[in-house]
UniProtKB/Swiss-Prot annotation:
Keywords: Ribonucleoprotein, Ribosomal protein, RNA-binding, rRNA-binding. One of the primary rRNA binding proteins, it binds specifically to the 5'-end of 16S ribosomal RNA. InterPro entries: NA-bd_OB-fold, Ribosomal_uS17, Ribosomal_uS17_bact/chlr, Ribosomal_uS17_CS. Pfam families: Ribosomal_S17. Gene3D superfamilies: Nucleic acid-binding proteins. PROSITE patterns: RIBOSOMAL_S17. GO terms for cellular component: cytosolic small ribosomal subunit. Belongs to the universal ribosomal protein uS17 family. One of its GO terms (molecular function) is rRNA binding. It comes from Aquifex aeolicus (strain VF5). This is Small ribosomal subunit protein uS17.
Length: 107
């Protein structure tokens, strides 16, 4: 039976997290803040706890405010153990908003 089961590939077994890019100042590295809701141990109220992860961004595509999915990987440096898998949602940029306003005024 175990032979008949499909084996998951190693990269499918790794953890995936979704978070917001808070810093992109380093080359090929972004800092991603991941929020999670945790119940208070005594009172039971859900509290939002956040943690920051350094993630590898090979092509420097991520910008501050982007919502990204990151995947656990082998250690790439002292603090980097995550890789950006994909950008789920781009953050709006002031330049983009100005261009949209100018296009709207021209019409």
């Amino acid at each position: 039976m175990t032979e008949q089961k499909q084996q998951k590939k190693w990269h499918e077994k790794r953890k995936h997290l979704v978070g917001v890019v808070v810093s992109d100042k380093m080359d090929k590295t972004v800092v991603v803040k991941v929020d999670r809701k945790v119940p208070h141990p005594i009172y039971g109220k859900h509290i939002i706890k956040s943690k920051k992860y350094h993630a590898h961004d090979e092509h420097n595509e991520c910008r501050v405010g982007d919502i990204v999915m990151i995947r656990e990987t082998r250690p790439l440096s002292k603090t980097k153990r995550w890789v950006v898998v994909k950008i789920l949602q781009r953050a709006r940029r002031p330049e983009e908003e100005i261009q949209k306003q100018q296009e709207g005024q021209e019409q």
